[in-house]
């Protein structure tokens, strides 16, 4: 029988970012209690030698699985050291891969009482408005004018440590254009 290949989307991530992600997940699972129902699987609990860890996040009757890998082929850059992350949404026997932005929105939808979802309606009805959303990574668009006005009136409180964001885990901070320092008209800036 011939080999059968299965292709998965894996975002290349540096190992320090993966360590930070794991640390935040464990903190909110065991200390703050905000990640109730989440489960963390260590590398020795998996049959795949490339899997470093798995975080299972229940979303109703489905779940989101964030898998970190090690020992992958290195990328084209020196800092791509064979670490990676894949994000999968599973429900019964069906599974599909999702992008980090959608993963953050799903986590936000199931785990947080959000200011933007209910603030406008509550304020019109005269109810007390929750001043902020604890999971800002779940927001990726500009809100309505009403939302922006209410957001300007309330002061959001910062939560330390922040809740782990899948988008932040997979963002490409290495390939962002670098700003060169120098005086106006300098040779380094203009290239002349």
UniProtKB/Swiss-Prot annotation:
Processed in virion by the viral protease. Belongs to the primate lentivirus group Vif protein family. This is Virion infectivity factor. Zn(2+) binds at residues 108, 114, 133, 139. Residues 151-180 are annotated as: SOCS box-like. The lineage of its organism: Viruses, Riboviria, Pararnavirae, Artverviricota, Revtraviricetes. Counteracts the innate antiviral activity of host APOBEC3F and APOBEC3G by promoting their ubiquitination and degradation. Acts as a substrate recognition component of an E3 ubiquitin-protein ligase complex: mechanistically, Vif hijacks a host cullin-5-RING E3 ubiquitin-protein ligase complex (ECS complex) and the transcription coactivator CBFB/CBF-beta to form an active E3 ubiquitin-protein ligase complex that targets APOBEC3G and APOBEC3F for polyubiquitination, leading to their degradation by the proteasome. A motif (BC-box-like motif) lies at residues 144-153. Residues 162-192 are annotated as: Disordered. A motif (HCCH motif) lies at residues 108-139. Residues 171-172 are annotated as: Membrane association. Vif-defective viruses show catastrophic failure in reverse transcription due to APOBEC-induced mutations that initiate a DNA base repair pathway and compromise the structural integrity of the ssDNA. In the absence of Vif, the virion is morphologically abnormal. HIV-1 lineages are divided in three main groups, M (for Major), O (for Outlier), and N (for New, or Non-M, Non-O). The vast majority of strains found worldwide belong to the group M. Group O seems to be endemic to and largely confined to Cameroon and neighboring countries in West Central Africa, where these viruses represent a small minority of HIV-1 strains. The group N is represented by a limited number of isolates from Cameroonian persons. The group M is further subdivided in 9 clades or subtypes (A to D, F to H, J and K). The record marks 150-151 as: Cleavage in virion (by viral protease). One of its GO terms (cellular component) is virion component. The modification Phosphoserine is found at residues 144, 165. Residues 54-72 are annotated as: Interaction with host APOBEC3F and APOBEC3G. Pfam families: Vif. It is a peripheral membrane protein. Residues 75-114 are annotated as: RNA-binding. Its main location: host cell. Keywords: AIDS, Host cell membrane, Host cytoplasm, Host membrane, Host-virus interaction, Membrane, Metal-binding, Phosphoprotein, RNA-binding, Ubl conjugation, Ubl conjugation pathway, Virion, Zinc. InterPro entries: Vif. The modification Phosphothreonine is found at residues 96, 155, 188. GO terms for biological process: viral life cycle. Homomultimer; in vitro and presumably in vivo. Interacts with viral RNA and Pr55Gag precursor; these interactions mediate Vif incorporation into the virion. Interacts with the viral reverse transcriptase. Forms cullin-5-RING E3 ubiquitin-protein ligase complex (ECS complex) by interacting with host CUL5, RBX2, elongin BC complex (ELOB and ELOC) and CBFB/CBF-beta. Within the ECS complex, Vif interacts directly with host CUL5, ELOC and APOBEC (APOBEC3F and APOBEC3G) substrates. Residues 151-164 are annotated as: Multimerization. It comes from Human immunodeficiency virus type 1 group M subtype B (strain 89.6) (HIV-1).
């Amino acid at each position: 029988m011939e080999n059968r290949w299965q292709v998965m989307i894996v975002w290349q991530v540096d190992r320090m970012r993966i360590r930070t992600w794991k640390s935040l997940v464990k903190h909110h699972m065991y200390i703050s209690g905000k990640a109730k129902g989440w489960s963390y699987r260590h590398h020795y609990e998996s049959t795949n030698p490339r899997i470093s860890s798995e975080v299972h996040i229940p979303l109703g009757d489905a779940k989101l699985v964030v898998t970190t890998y090690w020992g992958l082929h290195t990328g084209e850059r020196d800092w791509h050291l064979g670490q990676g992350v894949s994000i999968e949404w599973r429900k019964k026997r069906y599974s599909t891969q999702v992008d980090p932005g959608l993963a953050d929105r799903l986590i936000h939808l199931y785990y947080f009482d959000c200011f933007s979802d209910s603030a406008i309606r509550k304020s019109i009805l005269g109810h007390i408005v929750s001043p902020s959303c604890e999971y800002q990574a779940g927001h990726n668009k500009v809100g309505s004018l009403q939302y922006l006005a209410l957001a300007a009136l309330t002061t959001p409180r910062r939560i330390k440590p922040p809740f782990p964001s899948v988008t932040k885990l997979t963002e490409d901070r290495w390939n962002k254009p670098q700003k060169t320092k120098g005086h106006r008209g300098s040779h380094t800036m203009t290239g002349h």
